[in-house]
Amino acid sequence: MPTLEMPVAAVLDSTVGSSEALPDFTSDRYKDAYSRINAIVIEGEQEAHDNYIAIGTLLPDHVEELKRLAKMEMRHKKGFTACGKNLGVEADMDFAREFFAPLRDNFQTALGQGKTPTCLLIQALLIEAFAISAYHTYIPVSDPFARKITEGVVKDEYTHLNYGEAWLKANLESCREELLEANRENLPLIRRMLDQVAGDAAVLQMDKEDLIEDFLIAYQESLTEIGFNTREITRMAAAALVS
């Protein structure tokens, strides 16, 4: 079983999948791409932590639950940091912070305006669905150490997605129009983020179309659970086509 102290050589001892189907985890090309992909997931977990703590200022009755979610995100961050160290890769955190800047700015604007539904749509739906799609696509082509970490993380991300769904479902009638507007403003950002990372993801053998498909499936399932009808969801998903 992988441990956080497992050395670089551990990635060569895969018992999962065929070596012919997996990328060369030791190549310079792989490590270069991984430095950005790994940074994105590390920064994404940090952003999620900060966002859940911030949402707690808008939902004081939910502070303890949001702190619990935030604490989980920090565990994820530590795990993904260990994944980079296991491969001997330094994460490109400057790239990752810039990568998340548009969504971060929109979240902070909504937070300042007290728009709880928008904050939840950005963090608990869009970002969580983005993460889930990325992790699902990554797991089959990951090194054994990262596979174990990522499989544990993705289970937690569904808990976070479900939290956002439950609150928005309970408050849908009062925030429907705000959510429609937030979707129009933020879903195109997710599509651009997926496009931006496609080249590096391909080096890791993560297919761009699989990423987009998995994301849209997870996001549309959340919108259905919240209570949007098929027509509304179709129109909301169309925002992803805006470049």
From Swiss-Prot:
Binds 2 metal cations per subunit. The catalytic dinuclear metal-binding site could be either a di-iron or a manganese-iron cofactor. Keywords: Iron, Lyase, Metal-binding, NADP. Fe cation 2 binds at residues 73, 128, 160. Fe cation 1 binds at residues 45, 73, 76. Gene3D superfamilies: 1.20.1260.10. GO terms for molecular function: aldehyde oxygenase (deformylating) activity; transition metal ion binding. Pfam families: Ald_deCOase. HAMAP family: Aldeh_decarbonylase. Belongs to the aldehyde decarbonylase family. Catalyzes the decarbonylation of fatty aldehydes to alkanes. Requires the presence of ferredoxin, ferredoxin reductase and NADPH for in vitro decarbonylase activity. Involved in the biosynthesis of alkanes, mainly heptadecane and pentadecane. This is Aldehyde decarbonylase.
